[in-house]
Amino acid sequence: MKSHIQSLLEQTLESFKQQGIVPADFEARIQVDRTKDKSHGDLATNLAMMLTKVAGKNPRELAQLIIDTLPASAYVAKVEIAGPGFINFFINDSALADQLQNAVNDEHLGIKLPTPQTVVVDYSSPNLAKEMHVGHLRSTIIGDSVVRALEFLGHKVIRQNHVGDWGTQFGMLLAYMEELRAKNGEKAQLELSDLENFYRAAKLRFDESAEFATRARQLVVELQSGDEYCNKLWREFNDISLSHCHEVYARLGVSLTRADVHGESAYNADLEQVVKDLDAQGLLTESNGAKVVFQEAFRNKEGEPLPVIIQKADGGYLYATSDLAAMRYRSNVLKADRVLYFVDLRQALHFQQVFSLAKLAKFVREDMSLEHLGFGTMNGEDGRPFKTRSGGVVKLVDLLEEANVRALELVRSKNPDMDEATLTEIARVVGISAVKYADLSKNRTSDYIFSFEQMLSFEGNTAPYLLYAYTRVAGIFKRVTDLDLSQAKIVLEHEKEKDLGNKLAQFGEILSRVVDKGQPHVLCAYLYELAGAFSSFYEACPVLAADNDAQKNSRLLLAQLTARTLQKGLNLLGIETLERM
């Protein structure tokens, strides 16, 4: 409905250009918003106020001219001017009912699909050789929810798990394995089963022994030179580390697979060419022995240019080098229209610089969109980054296990007579969903406080509340036998039916925001509002005890659409639904 009103306004603006009311080359981003007050209609635009300056007319006069020029539409019951020149649209109830009717048998719930694009999504991307920790949660689940929404809307999505599988940490691990094998022979392999402790011990040796650190750096050079022994061990480290990652992904219900892994090492062969190409274009400068690029747009507080370091004085490459190689690959090989990077907000300057440089060096097509969709940090209840009681990093697997234990206690307290197998399965879904939803429901760019107590509450905008809301709606159909809604028609008579219908009709608009802005929190807010709208409808409008069959079937269709929308919305967030709780 919103896109329909936008189309009417676009046609009106085109007519204004033809009549000379506004300049022919005038470009306006027409904004149509949902109204908060029903007395102001369903949708509103400030187009008249946007045109005031170029048209040389006062906004209320322009608003009336817009209304007079609008093409006729069966969807619009009436149009009014409000305040200084807002235009309010009242949607025809029968048109809304028709829109909902079309959604009933449509797998996309009546959503008009956009023109499909190829979208590369870079997310999760942990450094290997260590277990995943809570710092990896946000990129992993925010990226995955946006991927799901993109695919649902018909886009071709290419997941890229740009793991940190190269660099100094591997020299450290190789040197430590070398020491262990010198002492214990092949038995040293067993110590790799606990990768985290193995890494910690190697790091301790690296920090304490200059001789060990020198050997570690030497092994990095040997690894990069293709030494067979070093490469064999490196592959073992990676395989063990990736196995840990995919155990976590499976538990989180994240859609990444081994086939999506395209880490730093995948671009090793391209890095030298990146340097040569930048040099050939005259973009490289030498600074303290390193090869760097300075761009006029990037300066520090003192006004000094900020470098993008491409190659260190010792010949080593940096993140910027592999990122540039990856961008070129994603543009030229993957043919991406958009590339989305779900990486911590603290990397904002890095991405601004490399995006700018990639365009400047023509490593990427001009029409390819590079987007850093950064996020804030997950903090403990003290407001500081989330840590263990001893101050260490919290392993993601430990966090999920605690969520499961707490969810099991909660579910058992509410269902003392339920069998253990059912309790365990419900707790698994509730625990994981609570952790994911608590994160996804927060604005991506904000920091947030992690609280098990809040996220496991059955009140407010939480996963348990929404999971229960879904079971409540779906439960209506368990009380109906021989249900046949094939001939049923949606009719919106009661005010609460209209409110629910209006909310259901917004699903497509919400998903557009999720994929355009990378903002799953707007979907969470929508699902919470939808659950509330259904609750108000259910209290005011008897469904199974409706006045007649036509009314009952209409309300059953509204309930069915609500259940499907809640389920689809939660699934797009990567959250399973339950049939009972």
Curated annotation (Swiss-Prot):
First-listed, main subcellular location of the protein, grouped into a coarse class: cytoplasm
GO molecular function, one term: ATP binding
Catalytic activity of the protein: tRNA(Arg) + L-arginine + ATP = L-arginyl-tRNA(Arg) + AMP + diphosphate
Sequence motif 'HIGH' region, location on chain: 126-136
EC code(s) of this entry: 6.1.1.19
The organism's place on the tree of life at top rank: Bacteria
CDD domains linked to this entry: Anticodon_Ia_Arg, ArgRS_core
Subcellular location: Cytoplasm
EC class (word): ligase
InterPro entries, per database record: aa-tRNA-synth_I_CS, Arg-tRNA-ligase, Arg-tRNA-synth_N, Arg-tRNA-synth_N_sf, ArgRS_core, DALR_anticod-bd, Rossmann-like_a/b/a_fold, tRNAsynth_Ia_anticodon-bd
Pfam families linked: Arg_tRNA_synt_N, DALR_1, tRNA-synt_1d
GO biological process assignments: arginyl-tRNA aminoacylation
GO CC annotation: cytoplasm
Listed SMART domains: Arg_tRNA_synt_N, DALR_1
Keywords noted in UniProt: Aminoacyl-tRNA synthetase, ATP-binding, Cytoplasm, Ligase, Nucleotide-binding, Protein biosynthesis
Family, per entry: Belongs to the class-I aminoacyl-tRNA synthetase family.
PANTHER family: ARGININE--TRNA LIGASE, CYTOPLASMIC (PTHR11956:SF5), ARGINYL-TRNA SYNTHETASE (PTHR11956)
Subunit architecture: Monomer.
Protein name in the entry: Arginine--tRNA ligase
Organism of this sequence: Shewanella baltica (strain OS155 / ATCC BAA-1091)
Lineage: Bacteria, Pseudomonadati, Pseudomonadota, Gammaproteobacteria, Alteromonadales
